[in-house]
UniProtKB/Swiss-Prot annotation:
Keywords: ANK repeat, Repeat. InterPro entries: ANKRD_45/46/60, Ankyrin_rpt, Ankyrin_rpt-contain_sf, Ubiquitin-like_dom, Ubiquitin-like_domsf. The lineage of its organism: Eukaryota, Metazoa, Chordata, Craniata, Vertebrata. Residues 1-57 are annotated as: Disordered. CDD domains: Ubl_ANKRD60 (cd17063). Residues 15-26 have a biased composition (Gly residues). ANK repeats lie at residues 219-249, 252-281. This is Ankyrin repeat domain-containing protein 60. The keyword rRNA processing does not apply. Residues 96-172 form the Ubiquitin-like domain. The gene is ANKRD60. The keyword Iron-sulfur does not apply. Pfam families: Ank_2.
């Protein structure tokens, strides 16, 4: 063998040996599944101190998409532009329903707001339900009493939700209010509305003199207030004839004429005006019976009060007069003229 040929054979052998040595490095994981595990063990033996290479990589790689997804979700919520595009599901003004628990009646209250206080709601219910402000007890869901200075939002009251209205049970108020709601004079007569009544509660058992008089007059006023709101003509007439004052006021400064006007109770309005009620009395909000009737679109009641006030100013006192009857009939039938000519007999 010549020297050149032998040199060529040695070069070929060296190239083949290098290829074999490089083969395991590039293809060990494919040809030998346990190669990675063995290399991990060797790395641990050399003092790397970490977990196996295969297991660590398998946990770390899937975590990246989750982190990205979490980041994307946070950007959707926190990005001001994205948040402004989301619809506001809570309306600024909404409707509530209020159930008077003692009677089961349901009342619809419009124009409620999240920042509306419980006191403001009770002021509206004073007109709508006819229960004086100080006798109302409101509850929602958990049966806890709603405090006056809290808001509807504070109690998580939702649009269309039902709020329970209860009457305070102390001092016999529940029985009195229910009798006035029913409008039965015979029941009212037994519930301590006059000074000669034998009706007593645990609170009033020892009342005498002015204290007893004040207690009975207060109860007579509440009965008149509720009966006027409900339009019970016979009950209103009975109460007025037995000393109930149509000039007394509720804690909100309202008279029975205020609530009668709020409900458009024409017959009761006339009866109250006959007994000296004023259309110009203002409540704590500055509203008169006429302005309340106007705000609540009770046009007929508004006209009646204006007409009766003008007739009273003209000096006519007997409302049973024929001219008065004709005038009232024209108002009830929808007569729209603000001027009337009074012809002498």
């Amino acid at each position: 063998m010549t020297r050149g040929r032998a040199w060529g054979m040695r070069r070929a052998a060296a190239g083949a040996g290098g290829a074999r040595a490089a083969g395991p490095t590039g293809g060990a994981s494919r040809l030998h599944p346990n190669a990675g595990r063995r290399s991990g063990a060797r790395a641990g033996a050399q003092g790397c101190g970490g977990p196996r290479v295969g297991s660590a990589d398998s946990r770390a790689l899937p975590a990246q998409p989750l982190a990205c997804a979490r980041g994307r979700s946070q950007r959707l919520v926190c990005d001001p532009k994205a948040a402004s595009a989301l619809p506001d599901l809570a309306p600024d003004v909404f409707v509530l329903r209020v159930r008077l628990e003692e009677t089961g009646e349901m009342f619809r209250v419009a124009n409620c707001r999240g920042d509306m206080t419980v006191r403001e709601l009770k002021e509206e219910l004073d007109l709508m339900v006819g229960i004086p402000f100080n006798l109302q007890r409101l509850q929602y869901l958990d049966e806890g009493v709603l405090m006056d200075d809290t808001t509807l939002k504070f109690h998580d009251v939702v649009p269309g939700g039902i709020i329970s209205l209860c009457i305070w049970h102390h001092d016999g108020w529940t029985e009195l209010v229910l009798a006035a709601v029913e409008g039965d004079p015979s029941k009212l007569s037994c519930l301590g509305l006059t000074e000669d009544s034998f009706y007593r509660t645990a609170n009033s058992e020892h009342f005498e003199g002015e204290k007893w008089k004040h207690w009975t007059s207060q109860r007579a006023f509440v009965a008149l207030y509720v009966a006027s709101h409900r339009g019970h003509f016979d009950a209103v007439q009975y109460l007025l004839e037995h000393g109930a004052s149509c000039l007394s006021r509720s804690p909100l400064g309202r008279t029975p004429l205020h609530v009668a006007a709020a409900m458009g109770r024409s017959d009761c309005i006339i009866l109250l005006l006959q007994h000296g009620a004023s259309i110009h009395d203002r409540d704590a909000k500055g509203e008169t019976p006429i302005s309340i009737a106007h705000r609540l679109n009770h046009t007929l009641s508004e006209r009646q009060m204006v007409l009766l006030h003008r007739i009273a100013k003209s000096g006519i006192r007997d409302l049973n007069d024929l001219v008065m009857k004709n005038a009232l009939q024209r108002v009830k039938s929808g007569f729209r003229s603000e001027k009337m000519t009074m012809t002498p007999h």
